[in-house]
């Protein structure tokens, strides 16, 4: 694959000061570096830093994976990659990436926004567009953090209309695909296509793509390069080993991530930030004083289930939180207390939503509540 329109007369250098600079192109693939223009020692450090390993269950490590791409001639790095800190014995230095050329290929579109935005949404759009305008020859993108119900979808559609670039929307659930299609058709005059498994409808203004499909299937990369704007809904999901492959294929000139909770317990949010950018706007959540959170203290005498469980992880005996949570859900006296609380709330005529991370636990609670109803 030819990542660069490389001219042999271009002077691409790697020079040393306190910071070691590496020249690169920024284009549809990311930060592209010709491998014969970077020292092997630096190339090794870059590969090392961009091979990540998720953390799970308080210290246990999962399989590592790469968040860069390379072939015989080029290495492609995340477009928002910050200077890499290297500690080599007693020496410490940074590898910084100098964008020598900025070159994107994409298609333009002419679509209009038909909705009406709230004042705070208009303010966000003005802020984001101004940020893009001032990012000359720099990566353009970032994450917009809004609470659930904050109008992330409508806001993103409005930005797509203003930029006037062929747009790809990435989602990880079928219902989100349907929701985005409905919203795009309701709030703009854009034509809408779908990328999902064998369906590859790209001759449209806005295309909605399933992350599962794009990460697993090698679609025509030249067609994917036509998108000038990529919007990622629930962007925090793209930090995983499988989903992060999507980032290597969809690095457009403009990238916008949307999330109410841009966090990951496995530490892999850094993967998302490297490719999509940092949080560029976040709305502070207003405190709802109508909500009462009440703690219920419970003491269990169940010596079989209510005790610490451990397992071996990398040669160390560590707490097995997964097993302990499973056991908590099986303590009969605890579940009976919950059922009695639900029954008392039911008698007040309230609608009740019960949440649990275990389906088996919900089945136990439902069975107990059903007996009370009968």
PLM feature spans:
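N-terminal pre-P-loop "Q-motif" helix
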Residues: 114-140
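Walker A/P-loop
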Residues: 134-161
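Conserved helix/coil segment N-terminal to the catalytic DExD/H
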Residues: 196-229, 240-245
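Post-DEXD/H (motif II) to motif III coupling segment of the RecA-like Helicase ATP-binding lobe
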Residues: 228-229, 236-299
């Amino acid at each position: 694959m030819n990542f660069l329109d490389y001219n042999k007369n271009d002077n691409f250098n790697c020079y040393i000061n306190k910071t070691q600079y590496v020249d690169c192109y920024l284009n549809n693939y990311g930060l592209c570096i010709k491998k014969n223009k970077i020292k092997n020692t630096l190339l090794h450090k870059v590969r090392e830093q961009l091979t990540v390993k998720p953390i799970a269950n308080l210290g246990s490590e999962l399989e590592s994976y790469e968040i860069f791409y390379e072939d015989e001639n080029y290495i492609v790095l995340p477009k928002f990659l910050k200077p890499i800190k290297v500690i080599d014995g007693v020496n410490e230095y940074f590898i910084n990436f100098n964008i020598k050329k900025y070159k994107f290929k994409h298609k333009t579109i002419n679509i209009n926004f038909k909705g009406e935005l709230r004042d705070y949404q208009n303010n966000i759009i003005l802020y984001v567009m101004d940020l893009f305008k001032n990012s000359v020859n720099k990566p353009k993108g970032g994450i917009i953090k809004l609470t659930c119900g904050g109008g992330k979808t409508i806001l993103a559609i409005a930005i797509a209309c203003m930029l006037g670039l062929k747009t790809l929307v990435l989602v990880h659930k079928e219902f989100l695909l349907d929701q985005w299609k409905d919203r795009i058709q309701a709030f703009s005059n854009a034509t809408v296509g779908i990328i999902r498994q064998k369906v590859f409808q790209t001759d449209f203004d806005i295309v909605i793509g399933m992350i599962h499909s794009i990460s697993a299937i090698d679609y025509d990369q030249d067609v994917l390069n036509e998108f000038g704007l990529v919007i990622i809904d629930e962007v925090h999901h793209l930090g995983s080993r499988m989903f992060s492959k999507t980032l290597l294929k969809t690095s457009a000139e403009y990238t916008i991530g949307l999330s109410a909770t841009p966090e990951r317990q496995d530490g892999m949010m850094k993967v998302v930030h490297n490719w999509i950018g940092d949080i560029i706007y976040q709305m502070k959540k207003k405190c709802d004083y109508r909500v009462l959170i009440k703690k219920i203290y419970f003491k269990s005498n169940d010596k079989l289930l209510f005790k610490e469980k451990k397992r071996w992880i990398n040669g160390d005996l560590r707490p097995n939180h997964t097993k302990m949570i499973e056991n908590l859900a099986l303590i009969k006296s605890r579940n009976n207390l919950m059922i009695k609380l639900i029954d008392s709330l039911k008698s007040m005529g309230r609608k009740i939503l019960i949440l649990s991370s275990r389906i088996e636990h919900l089945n136990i609670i439902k069975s107990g509540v059903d007996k009370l109803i009968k």
